[in-house]
Design a protein with these regions (language model features):
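Conserved active-site and cofactor/substrate-binding residues in soluble primary-metabolism enzymes
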Residues: 57, 61-65, 69, 116, ...
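Internal helix-turn-beta structural module
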Residues: 166, 173-230
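Short beta-strand elements
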Residues: 14-40, 109-128, 171, 183-190
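Glycine-rich, mobile lid/loop segments that gate access to catalytic sites or pores
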Residues: 1-105
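Flexible helix-coil linker/hinge segments at domain or subdomain boundaries
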Residues: 70-81, 138-144, 151, 157-167, ...
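Conserved ATP-utilizing enzyme core subdomain
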Residues: 94-120, 229
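C-terminal catalytic subdomain
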Residues: 117-119, 124-170, 178-186
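Short acidic, glycine/serine/threonine-rich loops at helix termini
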Residues: 28-30, 46-48, 107-110, 132-135, ...
Length: 230
């Protein structure tokens, strides 16, 4: 609008993680909000201010503006539209803004080449769900590749262990944050072995989080993904 947050530039993305009731599958609340936005370098080092201090002040200003200007406006717009989603935005959400720090260079200059192709052919055809991330053009430092391998590894082991006949494992990440923001499991109502009778998909997901180190660097190390053999 040219009145507030005038330092913003065109390249940006957001990610919202919603917590659901695992029994009714109804949304409970907004759990995490991630906003990555390009911006001017509107605070510069100098006059006793170091480069690191200047960057920290910029990011703190952007975080505060997202929290006090952007999110309240989004909520107000949803309320005016009578959208029930407005009720999911409380005060207890986790907020990450520009988790990797300064984001001045954006658009094609910043991301050219990080694309992909044939994402469905490379994975499960039309049989399984896909989050949209491609393997092509990306090394294993990108969760599009490494976390896809990790989720497949977990799913294969759940089936091999008899936990489910069929299972979907979904991992959600945000740039600059090592741990997944959410772990979702769907066993498609597969029968459980006697020892696991009554265990919900949500409990399986929580156990996955405790048993597996799902940080990208840990996945790379576990599977030896720095070796160019895939």
């Amino acid at each position: 609008e040219g009145e507030v947050m005038t330092y913003l530039r065109p390249d940006s993305k957001s990610q919202v993680t919603i917590e659901y009731d695992e029994r009714t599958n109804k949304p409970l609340r907004v759990h995490t909000i991630v906003v990555s936005t390009q911006h001017d370098e509107f605070i510069l080092p100098g006059n006793g201010l170091t480069e690191k201090e200047a960057e920290e002040r910029m990011q703190e200003r952007i975080r505060e503006d997202v929290r006090t200007i952007l999110i309240p406006r989004v909520k107000a717009r949803l309320e005016r539209a009578g959208d029930k989603l407005a009720g999911l935005i409380g005060d207890d959400y986790i907020l990450h803004v520009n988790p990797t720090g300064k984001f001045v260079i954006g658009g094609p200059h910043g991301d050219t080449g990080l694309t992909g192709r044939k994402i469905i052919v490379d994975t499960y055809g039309g049989r399984g769900a896909h989050g949209g991330g491609a393997f092509s053009g990306k090394d294993s430092s990108k969760v599009d590749r490494s976390a896809a391998y990790a989720s497949r590894h977990i799913a294969k082991n759940l089936v091999a262990a008899g936990v489910a006949d069929e299972v979907l494992v979904e991992l959600s990440y945000a740039i600059g944050i090592a741990q997944p923001l959410s772990i979702y499991v769907d066993t498609y109502r597969s029968p459980r072995p006697a020892a696991l009778e009554g265990m919900t998909d949500g409990e399986i997901a929580r156990r996955i989080g405790r048993l597996f180190d799902l940080r990208p660097a840990a996945i790379v190390k576990r599977f030896g993904l720095k070796n160019p053999i895939f």
